[in-house]
C-alpha cells in the first residue's frame, strides 16, 4: 500500500471518531423521511443515478411515485424476483448483499476481518442470551447502498425476544471492518432471537453512520433510547418472511448453535448473495 493510500485510510478512521455520528444520522434521517415533492425527487434522482438503481425489478417502477426517499430506499420487489430456496434443510441468505465473513464462532469470538474479531456476548448484549451461540456458526452480510434493503428470515422460527442495543455509528465498509476493533459489537443494533427446530437462532441488524433507522415486524421502527431494551414476543415467521428493513442500510449477522448447520463451501468473504439463496443446510 502506498504512503498516500495509507494516510487516506488513517484519516478516514480518525474522522469516524470526530464526526458527531448520531447527530449527523438524525439530520440525514429527517431528509430521508421528508415528503416534500421537490426535495424527495431530487434526493431519489441523485441516489438512483449515483448507484445505478434498477427499478425494473421493483414493485413500483416509477421513482416519482414514492412518497419519500425512505419509501424508495425500502422498496418492495416484484413477485418472483427473489425465490426462497424451498428445501426444508436449507439456510437462506437474509438479504441481498455481499458476505463480509462466514464461518465458525471460535472461543466465543466472531471473525470480523484480518486481525479483528468481537465477542458474541458483546454483539448480543446479554451474556445469557448469547450463551447458545458461543461455539456456533455465523454469517455477516453487508448491504450496499444499491441493494434491496429488506431483511428476511434465513430459517423458520418463532421470534421470542428483541434486544435493542445502543451504540456508536461507525461507517461499515472494508476499511472500518479492518481498522475499527469490534465494529459490529460497538454500533447500534437490533438483536432478534428465535426458537427453531434447530435450537436458537439470532438475526442481528447492525446500524451505521447515516443509517436513518432500523425497523422490525415486531417492534416497528426503532426509536433510539440510549439504553438496552428487551422485549418478549411470540411471533412465528416462515423462512423467507420479511423480518425487518434498514433505512439507509448496513449489515445483517445470522447466528446458529454449534453442530446444527453447515455453510455451503462455495461461499467466502466478498461472495455476492441474494435474499432467499441457499447459503447452508442443516446437519
Swiss-Prot record:
Q: Which reaction does it catalyse?
A: a 1,2-diacyl-sn-glycero-3-phospho-L-serine + H(+) = a 1,2-diacyl-sn-glycero-3-phosphoethanolamine + CO2
**Which spans of this chain does the record mark as coiled coil?**
none
Q: Where in the cell is it found?
A: Cell membrane
The keyword Repeat is assigned to this record: no
Q: Which cofactor does it need?
A: pyruvate
Q: How is the cofactor bound?
A: Binds 1 pyruvoyl group covalently per subunit.
Molecular function per GO: phosphatidylserine decarboxylase activity
Quaternary form? Heterodimer of a large membrane-associated beta subunit and a small pyruvoyl-containing alpha subunit.
Name listed for the protein in its UniProt record: Phosphatidylserine decarboxylase proenzyme
Taxonomic source organism: Acinetobacter baumannii (strain ACICU)
